[in-house]
Design a protein with these regions (language model features):
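Short gly/ser/thr-rich secondary-structure transition/capping motifs
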Residues: 70-77, 147-149, 207-208
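Short hydrophobic helices that act as membrane-entry/anchoring signals
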Residues: 51-70, 133
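A short, well-structured juxtamembrane/interface segment
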Residues: 64-89
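Non-catalytic C-terminal accessory region of glycerolipid acyltransferases
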Residues: 2-34, 46, 149-299
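Catalytic core of membrane glycerolipid acyltransferases/transacylases, capturing the structured
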Residues: 85-145
Length: 299
């Protein structure tokens, strides 16, 4: 396991009451419909042309900028090469979500593989919708059972046919947050249903230094991304147990890759309406007590 990582303990971000909450403010809304007829994995020629064009832009521009901005270090690329033949048959990768650009770091780390990823529907209607969509973002439908069925079907078919799907199993982005939050089971359900492995990745922090510190300040931590070994689902036990087992194994793996002993991580491995734990004081975080009281009054 890596050495104990740097903990930024940021007081800047409005971390939410529940560990899967979004605090990012999206300014635009084009009211796009993500229903049962939406092409979640778009196979049209028009989409593929634009997808390739954006890939060139990301590799040529965004990846170098990201690498310089956070002085990105990637460790464990040997595991991509070592398990290349297995990964070519389909894989679900997971990681913590700690930076607005960290998906670019993932894309860089797993080259030559090209991933898709589930994306918050609000983001897919917002000002960054084009960038998100053409870098593999798949909008997660909300409040529509038939749409959710088609979303899941498209993803499982993509994985089963040899595709790569990257998931932020914590459910949302919390910038500069060190603990590994509880995982939702969706990614692990896809892995079990398709019989494909989970590939754990983890971001951890380093103290800012050099030009990054001068330009962005002492509260802009540097990033390290570590790539682990594939974890295969246990196909000998019933599906619900296999999903739970895989979720726990993956959470422990991400903790270790981030330099955290699983038994010392402050959160459980599986999300269950889990509340944020304030192990340090962040005045900008959503107040826990007040929100709890409000929820009680509403009931």
């Amino acid at each position: 396991m890596p050495n104990k990582p740097y903990d930024p303990q940021s007081k800047k971000y409005k971390y939410t009451k529940y560990t899967d909450g979004h605090y990012l403010v999206v300014k635009k809304n084009d009211h796009a419909k993500f229903d049962k007829d939406f092409p979640y994995i778009d196979k049209s020629k028009k989409f593929k042309r634009r997808f390739k064009a954006f890939r060139i832009l990301v590799v040529g521009l965004a990846m170098p900028v990201m690498a310089v901005r956070v002085l990105l270090k990637v460790e464990g690329r040997k595991n991509i090469k070592k398990h290349k033949e297995i990964l070519k048959q389909g894989v679900v990768s997971i990681s913590n979500h700690v930076h607005i650009w960290d998906y670019i770091a993932v894309m860089d780390a797993i080259r030559p593989f090209i991933p898709y990823h589930p994306s918050w529907a609000t983001n897919c209607r917002g000002e960054n919708k084009t960038l998100i969509r053409y870098t593999g973002g798949v909008p997660v439908p909300e409040g529509d059972i038939r749409a959710s069925y088609q979303f899941t079907k498209a993803i499982e078919e993509h994985i089963a046919s040899g595709g790569w799907f990257h998931t932020y199993a914590e459910g949302s982005m919390w910038e500069s947050y060190q603990p590994i939050r509880p995982f939702k089971k969706g990614a692990f359900r896809w892995a079990v249903k398709t019989g494909k492995p989970i590939l754990p990745l983890a971001f951890s922090y380093r103290k800012p230094k050099g030009l990054v510190r001068l330009i962005w300040g002492k509260n802009a931590p540097l990033l390290t991304l570590r790539i682990g070994e594939p974890i295969f689902p246990d196909m000998t036990i019933p599906t619900p147990q296999a999903i739970e087992k895989l979720t726990i194994q993956a959470h422990e793996a991400v903790c270790r890759l981030a330099g955290i002993e699983p038994s010392e991580n402050i959160y459980p491995p599986i999300y269950d309406n889990t509340l944020r734990i304030d192990y340090y004081h962040n005045p900008n975080a959503e107040p826990l007590d007040q929100q709890t009281e409000d929820a009680t009054e509403e009931k």
